[in-house]
Amino acid sequence: MADDDTVKGLAVEAESSRTDDTELTPQEQRRVIRRVDARLIVMLGFLHTVSLIDRGNLSTAAVAGMEKELHLQGNQYNVIAVVFFPPYICLQMLGPVLIRKLGPKLFLAGICFIWGVSMMCGGFVHNWAQLAGIRIIIGALEAGFFPAAVYLIATWYTRYQMQKRFAIFYLLGCVASAFTGFLSYGITFMNGLGGLTAWRWIFVIQGLITCTLAAISYFVLINFPDRMRSSKSRFLSHREYDFITDQINADRGDVRLEPFNLKKYLVAALDINIWGFGLVYFCTTTTAYSIAYFLPLIYREGMGFSMGASLCLFAPPYVAAGITMFATSWIGDKYRIRGPIIVFNAMLALIGLPLMTFTKGNGPRLVGCFLTTMGANSNVPAAMAYQANNVRGQWKRAACSAIFVGLGASGGMVGSLVFRSQDAPEYRPGMLTCIGMQAAAIVLVGLLTIRLYLRNCRVDRGELVIGDLPGFRYTY
């Protein structure tokens, strides 16, 4: 937990505020934050929706006949799923740099539009190798989105406004992408239209949706707060921009962007805390991606549901996850805690995974699907806030976002590999891997809590200054 004096009165939600400096009333402050939320969080949430859909629609396409038409054998499905991740991981560090150089409108809208076109091309492949190639291209393009979006969000808010925003950002994508099961089921009725089978239409239509949202985002997204203040934008008044920048400077003192220095950018990798936060995220995404990629197959092969039921049952666990995600994020921001939230969510998954693995009958296994989806996905914004709250400095924040998301993508690669076709219908090795990952996340949070607590004690004794900002304390 961080020292309250460091951030006292900064969150708009708090009763006290810096109205004496900004000349904004509390009501005006809340209105400013809501306007930023609407233009930034909601738009990024919709872009995140299509990114999740476009990387995770393999399972719905497989259920809709892709495996049969492309004559997939052995681990070819796993290969198609996993080739997304090497470029996605290797190119993470470029996203935060390029969004600063090109601006959010051009960079985020541009890569989103191109990967949408690539997704549409997936509807016209003739073999699994061509589809794998398209997945590589999509992985390279999506690599820039998530770390850049996380970095952009973190520059607009104080530390104890972040988790709710990260939750909304991820929740929109999580819940909306879950309902693609219904969309995919509807698309299956287009089977044969225009000479394309149902699974091909899934790729074409979802790619078209991506391109449309990318075009809209170009006109909606806002720039970094330090750039918006000096631009001709009428989105906020100068007084309102001053409120935003003043509260961030008082919270962590890093509104001003330092000149880019490659050495300083890369030296962030030497901070052991960043790797600890990233490993928590790695454990989280291993389970979250596993569920996203294989839940429809588990429904159909493991529980015996029909194709339509398997696609439609994909959504309800994610709706429950969205509720859990926002509730735990609200608690985390209100009480300024991070680690306990992650432990609670991991425990939900640790209850759900054994129910999915070791019980008989669809009732207990469905309960397990809900608990696992709730716990794993709720920990995504929790882990993001855990990392973002404990980093200061613009370029360090940018580098740490890339490392953090890269480790999360590595978890996705593991999740796509451990559920092997030869292990169907129970997928026990994959389930056991996810159980181990959730247990490891709890252990990592415990170790990080001890480390951050001890370093805060050194700050209290005047022995340490964190991030060159006197009075800054870690949040745990």
Q: Where are the regions a protein language model picked out?
A:
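Conserved MFS/SLC helix-loop-helix module at the cytosolic interface between two early adjacent transmembrane helices
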Residues: 90-129
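Central mid-sequence intracellular linker of multi-pass
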Residues: 159-173, 192-270, 429, 434-471, ...
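Helix-to-loop junctions at the C-terminal end of transmembrane segments
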Residues: 90-103, 323-337
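Cytosolic juxtamembrane N-terminal segment immediately preceding the first transmembrane helix
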Residues: 1-58, 68
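Helix-breaking motifs and short loop linkers at transmembrane-helix boundaries and internal kinks
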Residues: 54, 70-71, 94, 102-103, ...
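Residue-level signature of mid-helix packing/kink "hotspots" within the transmembrane helices
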Residues: 56, 85-93, 143, 177-178, ...
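Extracytoplasmic gate region of multi-pass secondary transporters
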Residues: 59-60, 263-329, 384, 416
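Extracellular/periplasmic helix-loop-helix junction of adjacent transmembrane segments
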Residues: 59-90
